[in-house]
Amino acid sequence: LFSQKKHFLRAKHNSYLIIYMPNKNIQFVDLGLVPYKETWDLQESLMAHTARVKLANRNQSEIRPTPNFLLFCEHPHVYTLGKSGDQSHLLMQESFLHTIGASFFKINRGGDITYHGPGQLVGYPIFDLENFFTDIHLYLRTLEEAIIRTCSSYGLVAGRIEGLTGVWIDHESQDPRKICAFGVKASRWISMHGFAFNVNADLSYFTHIVPC
């Protein structure tokens, strides 16, 4: 999906015009079960590294390709609240979290509150979107399409609901069931955060929130 569009980027160095092909290779890393804060810190580190490469390229005659990373993992039980989210959507006191073995983080992605836990595949694309396309709306729709195609490969009919971000099973019925949530951040066209795909998660943890 991300390799379908091909384009050249142009950069000026002194009086010369440099034309180079963007890097569409993606480095995949499976982190396994890992605490949320560790992956958040790793995302920030990879994003900062990519930003440094992009900044250095402005002043170099030879352009270094910017990397693209895709991190897969599961998390111990955790709730995360996006920067525009409403904390009242956490339907319990923070002091109650330890009784259900969960933690809570306010983070810098878009979207509201969501849950991560064992049995849920979480994906964090740390992409330089200038390697693909500079359109956040298209980026989200492309991530959704990847999940829809994955569901289809397992015999599940999934799709979108107009006006909403996410992927649902029985999306055209009166009772659609959300199977994948999305929340991203982009800075200098570098993405972080991503999607949460419910494969075999304990859905009872969603009863403690008003999910996004």
Regions found by a protein language model. Give the residues of each.
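N-terminal lobe of the biotin/lipoate ligase/transferase fold
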Residues: 19-176
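Short hydrophobic targeting helices and cationic amphipathic motifs
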Residues: 3, 8-9, 17
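Catalytic cores of processing enzymes, dominated by hydrolases/peptidases
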Residues: 177-212
